[in-house]
From Swiss-Prot:
GO CC terms: cytoplasm
PANTHER family: UPF0291 PROTEIN CBO2609/CLC_2481, UPF0291 PROTEIN YNZC
HAMAP family xrefs: UPF0291
Presence of the UniProt keyword Phosphoprotein in the record: no
Pfam families, alphabetized: DUF896 (PF05979)
Primary subcellular site in the record, as a coarse category: cytoplasm
Similarity comment text for this entry: Belongs to the UPF0291 family.
Superkingdom to which the source organism belongs: Bacteria
Compartments, record wording: Cytoplasm
Record's keyword annotation contains Amino-acid biosynthesis: no
Name of the protein: UPF0291 protein BLi02035/BL02933
Region (Disordered): 57-77
Entry keyword set: Cytoplasm
Length: 77
């Protein structure tokens, strides 16, 4: 995940952008930090989904086969 310092910098740049005073370097930095943040969020979400089992109202496991395979592969490593 992304560090607290980087999140603080993202917020700082966002506030500065609202006032309309970002330089080109700061805009580039903001984009880079946002992408890094999103990658962390996506990775976290994927890990969370890999632990989920989907069950229908009747109690049957209806987890998609692709997700089941990911779980099996994860246990092997």
């Amino acid at each position: 995940m992304i560090s607290k310092e980087k999140i603080a910098r993202i917020n700082e740049l966002a506030k500065k952008a609202k006032s309309g005073s970002l330089t080109d370097e700061e805009k580039a930095e903001q984009q880079k930090l946002r992408q890094e943040y999103l990658q962390g969020v996506r990775a976290s979400m994927k890990n969370t989904l890999k632990t989920v089992t989907i069950v229908d109202p009747e109690g049957n496991d209806v987890t998609p086969e692709k997700l089941k395979q990911e779980k099996r592969n994860r246990r092997l490593h």
